[in-house]
């Protein structure tokens, strides 16, 4: 029974993500979501007490996926720039593979929803920025080199790049892929980081 309930919850979240992808700029109502799934709104509320909880389910997926992978990168990669590259690539690739959820990441799908949802996404991006800042600060210990520019400034620059590419993806209705030109752009950023 619990497995069936979890499967239904996942099905609801997948349908919500798909609707966010195919209906850019439109607000998703529980009535539209229920109709898309072929169930009643009451059936949705048996699995989620509110639409905000549905969005929280998507946010939890984003948090779990990204933070788990970032921790893996921290364990597997030892070089500062390789770690930064891997985290940026992770963010861009995740967004590209999950267009509907990307609208949640940018806050686009959360307009008019509960403020705590946007706060959770902001907190996630702050945590990612803190991870990047920590990586940059560890360079002094790992590689016996420090950056000339403050690590907080560099971490913000790197995250802003990814945030901008993800926002561009949403604004273009998912036509401008976040990974477009990433290799060439990373080479420029890497050279700047080496001299920073």
From Swiss-Prot:
Any one GO MF annotation of this record: sequence-specific DNA binding
Coiled-coil intervals in this record? Answer: 108-135
Pfam families cross-referenced by the UniProt entry: SlmA-like_C (PF22276), TetR_N (PF00440)
Q: Which GO terms describe its biological process?
A: cell division; negative regulation of division septum assembly
Instruction: Write out the annotated subcellular location.
Output: Cytoplasm, Nucleoid
| The entry's keywords | Cell cycle, Cell division, Coiled coil, Cytoplasm, DNA-binding
Give the PROSITE patterns listed for this entry. Answer: HTH_TETR_2 (PS50977)
Q: Which residues form the HTH tetR-type domain?
A: 6-66
DNA bind region: 29-48
Highest rank taxon of the organism: Bacteria
Q: What is one GO cellular-component annotation here?
A: cytoplasm
Family affiliation: Belongs to the nucleoid occlusion factor SlmA family.
According to the record's subunit comment, the protein's assembly and interactions are: Homodimer. Interacts with FtsZ.
**UniProt name for this protein:** Nucleoid occlusion factor SlmA
């Amino acid at each position: 029974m619990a497995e069936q309930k979890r499967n239904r919850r996942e099905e609801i979240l997948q349908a919500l993500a798909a609707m966010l992808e195919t209906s850019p700029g439109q607000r998703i109502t529980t009535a539209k979501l229920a109709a898309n799934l072929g169930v009643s709104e009451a059936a949705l509320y048996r699995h989620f007490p509110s639409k905000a909880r549905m969005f929280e389910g998507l946010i939890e997926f984003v948090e779990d996926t990204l933070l788990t992978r970032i921790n893996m990168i921290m364990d597997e990669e030892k070089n500062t720039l390789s770690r930064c590259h891997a985290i940026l690539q992770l963010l861009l690739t995740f967004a590209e593979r999950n267009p509907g959820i990307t609208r949640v990441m940018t806050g686009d799908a959360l307009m008019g929803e509960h403020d705590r949802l946007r706060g959770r996404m902001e907190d996630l991006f702050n945590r990612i920025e803190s991870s990047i800042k920590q990586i940059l600060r560890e360079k002094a210990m790992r590689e016996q080199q420090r950056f000339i520019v403050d690590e907080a400034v560099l971490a913000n620059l790197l995250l802003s790049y990814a945030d901008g590419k993800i926002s561009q993806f949403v604004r273009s209705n998912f036509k401008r892929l976040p990974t477009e030109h990433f290799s060439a752009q990373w080479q420029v950023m890497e050279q700047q980081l080496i001299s920073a």
